[in-house]
Each structure stands twice: as structure tokens, then as C-alpha cells.
């Protein structure tokens, strides 16, 4: 494993932006518009990814690895020390130059910087710190920065870097310690959770400092996140959602990201995926994650040991409602906010608008449509002044059949990929024709 010498900055960018594509910073915006040689701008230039802010804005980030060299041999990673891939590494100044040039051209609004482990965790973390320090001080870059903290690095280095970054993340990698031991024996769960706890404590302490001293430097002001690979190991959806719930409760994470496993190494320890990455499963986990964070659901309400996986035909909220018809129909003009949140087709913004609007007048279905309620899902579960929108049966089979006819239950890009739910661990199947990207 050798880093190629004397390669251009553009070649490094090509190699290290491609190497970063499986590091999940965000949900994809789905934008694939390239430059036409006449107009200005290019939404798919090397390294540019798209994320969404809390208020729904699409934000472009320069997403790169500092280096794809790595001393570890994780079975699932395309950059592991035994992979036959082109190796490259930036210098701190090169990352600064790229970030500033992309920013000046209005290609990006921030930087997402991760890295393989070069030489040692401390050595790599020091390089990331130097990069952020130069960006903030020498280049006066005030844009958004999301940086990966390196497990096993000196806590002081992670702390210093946290005062320069907006968001910091430490990847959980795999859902359980047993899975991590099997596929990444060079890593340990404790090594990952320890810096996660340190960042959590640092954020809490810093909030108290900022409350006392308004101009105190801010430590990871956008919070911390993590990522789990889904489908490489035998954990079910119930285990994964329960782990995410614990992470939110015990580590105050802002976000847990889920990455559908893509078999890029063809390691014998990894499952065969003849149907491609489990994209629908990833989608259902994100929907459930949203319910945990914004809709006050608990993991035990969505799934159970007896029913450990999500319905592939219905989203988790619709599935929960159909299994709990005893709570429905809900009277829109009287139900409290928490109950409104549990109605399919009513989002947290719509629920707030309903509560505010009904203070002034009685609401009907026309009002709900204007408010933003998705009536094609909600109509089975609500009444307005004691009346349902249509004469519908409050029966599980009837509602289920009608909701399953709603094509929005499965996103278009997943439907068109020919996705179907398969056994995740039939390793006897041929691995030819796997989807690699």
C-alpha cells in the first residue's frame, strides 16, 4: 500500500472524493445536473454532495477524505489496507486551497472532511486539526465544517478540533459489538463510544460556558452524529432502531445515519446481495428514525422481538396505525397534539397548524387540505365534527389494501431499481452482478 507521488491536485480530488462516497454525511438531494459548457455551475463536480439543513434548505458540501490510506483491514471498507485501489493523500494546505476555491466559485457552502487512518489515529487527527486550524485562521473560512473524529486519537486533539468544527461525528460502523469484532477486529466498541461520550460532555459544558460568557468559543455547535452500515451483519430492524434510540437518549446525538451495505470488497465474511444494496430497508429505518426524533414514538411501539422487521409495503407510521385501530378515528377538533402526531398523513408542522387554527374556528377537510395534511392517508383515521371524509371501513384489511395502492409508500428510485426483500445471509448465492455503486 503506497500513496502515489507526484500526482496532480485534480487527480487527488478525483481519488479522494470517490473514496468518500460511502461516508454518509446526509441524505442525497438527487441532483445530477452537470455543466453544459455554456452556462455556469455544475452540481456533480468532483467531491460535491448535497445535504439538507433543519429548515429544508439544500446545502452543497465539498465531501472528501484527507487520505484513503488506512492501517486497518475492515472487511466492508473499500479503503482497507489490503484493497487494491489507488492511494492518495492531501496536505492541509491543499484541502484549504480546494475549499476556498470551490467556495469562491459558489460551488459549495461547507466542507465534509473524513479520512482513512494513516500511520496512527493521533497522526491522522493531528492532520485534520491542522487543516481546520488553517482554514479558520489563515484563510478566515467561516463556512460550515463537518469533520470525522478518529477513534483512538488523543482526547485533547479531538477537543481542539471540536472548537473549529460545526459538527463532529464518530462512526459506530456496525450496530453491535459482536458484528464489529467479526468484520473490523482492529476496532472496538469502547474505542468508538469513548470519544462520543467526550464530545457529548464537551458540548454540555460549552453550552454552560456560552450562557455565562457570550463570546466564549463554541464547541461542536451543530452537535454530533454517527453512522451505521445496514445489511452487512444479521441484526434485525428492531435491534437497529433500539440502538439508535439509545444513542439519542444516552449520547444526545443530533442524527444517526444509516448506510445500505454495498459489497465492494467481496470478502467471504460478507453476505451476498444479488438484489443489490437493501435500499428500501435503509429508507424504512430513516422513516422510523424520524418518528423517534420528531413524533415521540418509541422503538418498542414500532417493532418488537416477535415482529422484528418493518413492513416493506407500508411506512412505519401507517403500519403502526393499522395495528392500533383502537385509537382511531381521531377527532381533529379535539385531539391533543401528541395524538395528532400519530395520525398518518399529519406531520409535526401540520399538527401545530391544526392546534393553532382550531382556536379560531372549527376545522373541516377543506381546511386540513390547505394546512398541508395528506388526506389520501389521513382520511381513514380522522373525523371532522364527528364525520369521516368518505364512508370508509375501520378495518385493518380494507385500510391496508388501500394504503398499499399508494405508490408514495415506496420511493420511485427504489421501485425502479427492481428492489425486492431477500434473505440477507444466503452466502451460497453467486456474487456476480452485484451493484457496486
Region roles according to the model:
Residues 62-64, 93-104, 211-212:
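Short, charged beta->alpha transition segments
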Residues 100-114, 288:
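Short Fe-S-cluster ligation motifs
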Residues 96, 119-302:
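Conserved AdoMet/S-adenosylmethionine-binding subsite of the radical SAM
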Amino acid at each position: 500500500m503506497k500513496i502515489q507521488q507526484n500526482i496532480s491536485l485534480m487527480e487527488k480530488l478525483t481519488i479522494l472524493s470517490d473514496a468518500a462516497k460511502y461516508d454518509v454525511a446526509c441524505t442525497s438531494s438527487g441532483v445530477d445536473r452537470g455543466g453544459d459548457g455554456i452556462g455556469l455551475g455544475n452540481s456533480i463536480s468532483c467531491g460535491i454532495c448535497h445535504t439538507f439543513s433543519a429548515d429544508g434548505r439544500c446545502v452543497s458540501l465539498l465531501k472528501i477524505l484527507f487520505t484513503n490510506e488506512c492501517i486497518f483491514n475492515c472487511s466492508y471498507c473499500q479503503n482497507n489496507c489490503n484493497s487494491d485501489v489507488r492511494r492518495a493523500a492531501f496536505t492541509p494546505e491543499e484541502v484549504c486551497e480546494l475549499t476556498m476555491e470551490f467556495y469562491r466559485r459558489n460551488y459549495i457552502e461547507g466542507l465534509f472532511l473524513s479520512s482513512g487512518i494513516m500511520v496512527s489515529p493521533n497522526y491522522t487527527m493531528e492532520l485534520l486539526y491542522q487543516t481546520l486550524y488553517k482554514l479558520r485562521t489563515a484563510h478566515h473560512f467561516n463556512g460550515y465544517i463537518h469533520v470525522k473524529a478518529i477513534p483512538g486519537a488523543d482526547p485533547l486533539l479531538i477537543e481542539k478540533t471540536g472548537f473549529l468544527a460545526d459538527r463532529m461525528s464518530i462512526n459506530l460502523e456496525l450496530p453491535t459489538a459482536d458484528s464489529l469484532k467479526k468484520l473490523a477486529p482492529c476496532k472496538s466498541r469502547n474505542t468508538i463510544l469513548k470519544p462520543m461520550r467526550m464530545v457529548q460532555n464537551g458540548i454540555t459544558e460549552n453550552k454552560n460556558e456560552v450562557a455565562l460568557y457570550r463570546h466564549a468559543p463554541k464547541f461542536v455547535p451543530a452537535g454530533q452524529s454517527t453512522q451505521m452500515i445496514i445489511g452487512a451483519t444479521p441484526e434485525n430492524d428492531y435491534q437497529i432502531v433500539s440502538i439508535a434510540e439509545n444513542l439519542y437518549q444516552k449520547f444526545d446525538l443530533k442524527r444517526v445515519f444509516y448506510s445500505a451495505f454495498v459489497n465492494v470488497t467481496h470478502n467471504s465474511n460478507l453476505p451476498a446481495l444479488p438484489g443489490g444494496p437493501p435500499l428500501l430497508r435503509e429508507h424504512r429505518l430513516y422513516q422510523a428514525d424520524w418518528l423517534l426524533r420528531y413524533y415521540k414514538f418509541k422503538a418498542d411501539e414500532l417493532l418488537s422481538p416477535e415482529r422484528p422487521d418493518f413492513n416493506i409495503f407500508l411506512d412505519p407510521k401507517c403500519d403502526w396505525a393499522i395495528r392500533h385501530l383502537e385509537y382511531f378515528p381521531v377527532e381533529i377538533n379535539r385531539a391533543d397534539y401528541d395524538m395528532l402526531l400519530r395520525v398518518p398523513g399529519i406531520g409535526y408542522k401540520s399538527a401545530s397548524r391544526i392546534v393553532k387554527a382550531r382556536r379560531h374556528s372549527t376545522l373541516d377537510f377543506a381546511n386540513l387540505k390547505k394546512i398541508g395534511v395528506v388526506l389520501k392517508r389521513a382520511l381513514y383515521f380522522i373525523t371532522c365534527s364527528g364525520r369521516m371524509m368518505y364512508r370508509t371501513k375501520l378495518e385493518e384489511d380494507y385500510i391496508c389494501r388501500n394504503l398499499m395502492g399508494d405508490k408514495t409508500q415506496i420511493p420511485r428510485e427504489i421501485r425502479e431499481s427492481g428492489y425486492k426483500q431477500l434473505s440477507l445471509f444466503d452466502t451460497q448465492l453467486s456474487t456476480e452482478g452485484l451493484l457496486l455503486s
